[in-house]
């Protein structure tokens, strides 16, 4: 983009557009992003809030018959016995080499891309991301538009903000998922993770 998104020149050009709209009795609508999907503010959210994109957005797993030497790299480790699962994450590192039926979960990340200014798309479920997006985009426009909101500038529109997984083998994840699940349903999701993929355990719940 020739004009740096959301810099002083950007808003100066928007002010000129707004004034021309008023002069010609035309409405000027604000699009809340520089591409799509909305939510990353052309990379400004990523830059100001690295946790908005670098803590993972999905969970995947692999099965193992032996706990590998690299088990401490996995996010969550479950041991299966029949249809029951036990969360052994806290002790997994000390049990390297033990045989069993293990489900080893790891985080997956959205790929970086020039489309996202060299970052990846943000996690819209991450606490504070929506507030930071509004602060960096719409609050900036409000300083320029002022009393013209509702007049020459009727409002703004958004374009397909997304909560997506990285592929078909993953489920959506965000840092406070386990805490939010426990607060809402009264039990832990961790030992029941496999039920989100397979018809085992309390998968009907």
In which residue ranges do the predicted regions lie?
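Mature extracytoplasmic enzyme cores
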Residues: 4-205
């Amino acid at each position: 983009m020739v004009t740096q998104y959301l810099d002083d020149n950007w808003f100066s050009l928007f002010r000129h557009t707004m004034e021309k709209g008023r002069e010609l009795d035309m409405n000027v609508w604000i699009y809340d992003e520089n591409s799509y999907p909305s939510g990353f503010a052309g990379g400004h959210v990523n830059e100001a809030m690295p946790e908005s994109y670098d803590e993972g957005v999905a969970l995947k797993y692999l099965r193992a018959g032996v706990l590998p030497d690299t088990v401490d790299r996995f996010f969550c480790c479950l041991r299966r016995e029949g249809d029951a699962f036990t969360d052994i994450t806290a002790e997994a590192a000390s049990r390297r080499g033990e045989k069993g039926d293990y489900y080893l979960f790891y985080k997956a990340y959205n790929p970086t891309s020039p489309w996202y200014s060299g970052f990846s798309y943000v996690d819209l479920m991450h606490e504070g991301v929506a507030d930071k997006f509004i602060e960096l985009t719409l609050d900036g426009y409000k300083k320029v538009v002022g009393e013209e909101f509702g007049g020459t500038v009727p409002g703004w529109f958004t374009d397909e903000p997304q909560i997506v997984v990285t592929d078909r083998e993953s489920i959506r994840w965000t840092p406070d998922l386990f805490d939010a699940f426990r607060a809402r349903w009264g039990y832990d999701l961790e030992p029941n993770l496999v039920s989100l993929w397979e018809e085992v355990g309390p998968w009907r719940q």
